[in-house]
Design a protein with these regions (language model features):
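Conserved active-site "lid/cap" helical segment
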Residues: 1-57, 61-71, 75, 82, ...
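N-terminal extracellular/periplasmic Venus flytrap/periplasmic-binding protein-like
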Residues: 10-13, 24-33, 41, 164-252, ...
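Beta-strand segments within the central parallel beta-sheet cores of soluble alpha/beta enzyme folds
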Residues: 47-55, 82-87, 112-116, 164-171, ...
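Conserved catalytic cysteine-centered active-site region
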Residues: 56-109, 142-148, 208-234
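Active-site-proximal alpha-helical scaffold in enzymes
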Residues: 86-117, 155-185, 241-248
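Flexible glycine-/small-residue-enriched beta->alpha junction loops
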Residues: 105-154, 158
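Conserved small/polar residues in nucleotide/adenosyl-binding loops
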Residues: 268-274
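Hydrophobic alpha-helical segments, chiefly the membrane-spanning helices
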Residues: 279-283
Length: 283
C-alpha cells in the first residue's frame, strides 16, 4: 500500500467578500499567488506534479473553465501537469485531498497539488444564475437548503441557544485576534499583492465583538430562530494549497513529512433514525 503524506501547506488571508481587502482580486490570482509561494518554500520539481486538484463550490464565471488547469498556466507549470476542479460544497478542498490520496494509493502519481478557492465577491452565494429544478424544489426543498438554515437546524436539533452561539463567537474572535496579533498565523498565510497593495492578515476578525453588540443584531435566517450575522459563517474570499505526495517520494527528496493520511471517509449530516428527519441538518 502506497501511503500519502502532506509535506507543505499555505493559504491566502481570508477577507470579507464584497467589502474586504481582496474584493477586487480575481480568484485565479489569489490561488496562483498562493501556489507560487508554497512552491517557493517547498522545493519540488514541477515536472513531478501529476495533477492540480482544486475544490470550488461555485465553479463558474471567474472560477469556471476548470480553474485548476487555468492556474497551471499562471504558475509556470509544465504543460503535462493536469488540472481538475472538484465540487463537494463546503468539503470541496478536502475532497481534493481525498482524490489525491486515492490516486497515490493505486500508483496514479506521486505528487499532487490540492487546493481550494472561493471568491464570494466574484461569484456570490447561489452562483451567478440560481436555477433550481422546479419539480424537485417543490417536492423536496431541503435539497436546496442554505447554510444559514442548516445552522438554524443544527441549533434546534442540539438545543444551542443564541447566548451559547454568541459566547462561542466572542471566544472565537478573541482567540483569532490573539493569534493574529502575536503572528502565530504568519507561517501559514502568504501575502497577496494587487498592484501596490499587500494583504497579509485575515480580515474577518472582529476583536471588539461583545454580547452587547451581538444582542443588537437581527435574526438572519429565521424570525423564530437564533442565528444572526454575528454567529453565522461570513462570506469570504480566499484560497489554500497543500502538497500531497507519496511517502517514499517525500523521503527520497528530503521533504519534511507533516502528516500521513491513513484513511478518508464521507459522513452523512443527519443522525436521525426516521426518514422524515433524514435531511433536517442540511450539508
Amino acid at each position: 500500500m502506497r501511503n500519502a503524506v502532506i509535506v507543505g501547506y499555505k493559504r491566502s488571508p481570508f477577507t470579507f467578500a464584497r467589502k474586504g481587502e481582496m474584493a477586487n482580486i480575481r480568484p485565479e490570482d489569489i490561488l496562483s499567488q498562493t501556489i507560487n509561494q508554497l512552491l517557493n518554500e517547498i522545493q519540488i520539481n514541477k515536472n513531478d506534479i501529476e495533477d492540480i486538484i482544486t475544490g470550488c463550490a461555485y465553479p463558474e464565471g471567474a472560477q469556471g473553465n476548470n480553474i485548476a488547469k487555468i492556474v497551471s498556466f499562471m504558475t509556470d507549470m509544465p504543460e503535462h501537469v493536469a488540472g481538475m476542479t472538484v465540487n463537494r460544497w463546503c468539503g470541496s478542498s478536502m475532497q481534493a485531498i481525498h482524490d489525491a490520496t486515492g490516486a497515490i494509493a493505486i500508483n496514479s502519481g506521486d505528487v499532487f497539488l490540492c487546493c481550494g478557492v472561493e471568491s464570494m465577491t466574484f461569484i456570490p452565494m447561489n452562483g451567478l444564475t440560481y436555477d433550481p429544478h422546479p419539480q424537485l424544489s417543490k417536492d423536496n426543498p431541503n435539497v436546496y437548503m442554505s447554510m444559514g438554515i442548516t445552522a438554524e437546524n443544527v441549533a434546534k436539533k442540539f438545543d444551542i441557544s443564541r447566548k451559547e452561539q454568541q459566547d462561542f463567537a466572542i471566544s472565537s474572535h478573541s482567540k483569532a485576534n490573539s493569534a493574529r496579533e502575536t503572528n502565530m498565523l504568519d507561517n501559514e498565510i502568504v501575502p497577496i499583492t494587487n498592484n501596490d497593495q499587500i494583504i497579509n492578515k485575515d480580515g474577518g476578525i472582529r476583536p471588539n465583538t461583545s454580547h452587547e453588540i451581538l444582542d443588537g443584531l437581527k435574526l438572519a435566517f429565521d424570525e423564530n430562530g437564533t442565528v444572526t450575522a454575528g454567529t453565522a459563517s461570513p462570506l469570504t474570499d480566499g484560497a489554500s494549497a497543500v502538497i500531497v505526495c507519496e511517502e517514499e517520494y517525500a523521503k527520497k527528496n528530503n521533504l519534511n513529512i507533516l502528516a500521513r493520511i491513513k484513511s478518508t471517509c464521507l459522513l452523512y449530516t443527519s443522525d436521525a433514525a426516521d426518514e422524515e428527519d433524514s435531511v433536517d441538518l442540511g450539508g
